[in-house]
Amino acid sequence: MAIIRSVIAATALLGAAVNAQVVGTPFGFGAGTTGGGDATPAAPADTAELTEWLADDEPRVILIDKEFNFLGDECTDCECCIPDSNTCGDAGQNAIEVGIGWCGDYPTTTCTYDNAGLDGLDVGPNKSIVGVGDAGVIRGKGLRIHGTENVIVQNIHITELNPQYIWGGDAISLDGADKVWIDHVKISLVGRQMFVTGYESSGSVTFSNNELDGTTDWSASCDGHHYWTILALGENDKVTFANNYIHTTSGRAPKVGAPSFWHVYNNYWSDNTGHAFDVEESGTNVFIEGNVFEDINSAYNDDGTGAIFAVDSGSEATCSSVLGRTCVANSLTNSEYTAVADESVLSAFPADEEGDITILPVDQVAAYVLANAGVGKLSASGSTSGSSSSIAPSSSVPVIPTSTPLVYPTFTPPAVETNAIQKEHEVSTPAVPTPTPVPSSVGSHGSTAGSSHPPAFSRTSFES
């Protein structure tokens, strides 16, 4: 009987492993990413084994079948500063002094934070990191995909990276990476960027079906909305950003600031008290179509010098001569919008590299994204690709095509700006909404006890 039970248990584990393989295939600029390929799926026993498996050079399919909690190594009575943006005390964000001069002349204070968040988990080549059901959580650390290639991250929740502190940690950081697919990931409660691309170019990245949840008790804009959402400052990056849900934010959603190309379609932006797009630098091209903007204070920051083609009802036909199809207009409800249709973006669009995509009619986008973006929803959507670049008819059921492209840019940090936060928070914001409950354990803005010290800090994500 014991033997039979063992066989049944082993069979169940094998079935779970098979079912936890990557679902669907990457589309867009990230097409062709295979991750760990046919490696046998395996679940690490603990955080130490997860850390080891992620960083090695072996092709792996790593199952995240539970919560991996990296919290517990606190830095107490450590140096922080109070930036000008924090006008609301404990409801705002102070900043960790990380040794790059960012704090400048801001008033100093002491604070308690968790050391784990400051440096992400290194990810080596040929990895698939796949959550099982809705159980896959990485708490306290992000993923650092630097100088590597062929990585898939799917169906996990990354959360609680010192959300009360600027410089508390980045959820997903790319730098000099290629062939990366980030899919069905939820990110919440981070101190700094939810997604950032770093100094060296990360060529082909797909970012699809993800939920970026900015609900927070500690807001740099003092309104319960997370400011640091996406920062992309790398040159020559090609990004297809599709089917994502970005909500309860107040800025940098995204900020794109170096010559690169983003194709942004079928995303749902909701409840942004500041600005969504900040296209900062000349040579940057952002093509925005078929998205829903709902309750967005400003869809675009007017200060940037990059090129934007945002499709509205007056520019839908413009794509025909360049792309051979009609563009899909964006939808805006209770959102500030200035028409921007720089046709140089279409001329620069590397459609042959993006490959085949399917774009939903805009009236289907919000419902589709809410049903499919984030963790535990793989069976609902599948991440698949279509056979041709096309517009799905409005009567069709909103199913993601079998291979739709999504890619992320790489970032090159600008010079440190002491007053960067203050400068980017000039938009007035409403009263603070009811925030998300405090997670398992967080530090305080001020502290007078303890003797721990922060780890050596390596700034690899961004500096402004």
From Swiss-Prot:
Entry GO CC: extracellular region
Predominant subcellular localization, coarse grouping: secreted
Highest taxon listed in the record's lineage: Eukaryota
Pfam families assigned to the protein according to its UniProt record, in alphabetical order: Pectate_lyase_4 (PF00544)
Residues annotated as the enzyme's active site: R252
Enzyme nomenclature, EC number: 4.2.2.10
Cystine pairings recorded for this chain: C80-C103, C319-C327
Signal sequence, start to end: 1-20
UniProt keyword Signal, yes or no: yes
Glycosylation sites: N126
Cellular localisation: Secreted
Biased composition, class Low complexity, residue ranges: 439-448
Cross-referenced InterPro entries: Pec_lyase, Pectin_lyas_fold, Pectin_lyase_fold/virulence, PEL
Entry keyword set: Carbohydrate metabolism, Cell wall biogenesis/degradation, Disulfide bond, Glycoprotein, Lyase, Polysaccharide degradation, Secreted, Signal
UniProt keyword annotation of ATP-binding present: no
Reaction catalysis annotation: Eliminative cleavage of (1->4)-alpha-D-galacturonan methyl ester to give oligosaccharides with 4-deoxy-6-O-methyl-alpha-D-galact-4-enuronosyl groups at their non-reducing ends
Transmembrane segments: none
Function: Pectinolytic enzymes consist of four classes of enzymes: pectin lyase, polygalacturonase, pectin methylesterase and rhamnogalacturonase. Among pectinolytic enzymes, pectin lyase is the most important in depolymerization of pectin, since it cleaves internal glycosidic bonds of highly methylated pectins.
Family: Belongs to the polysaccharide lyase 1 family.
This protein's name: Probable pectin lyase F
Source species of the chain: Emericella nidulans (strain FGSC A4 / ATCC 38163 / CBS 112.46 / NRRL 194 / M139)
Gene: pelF
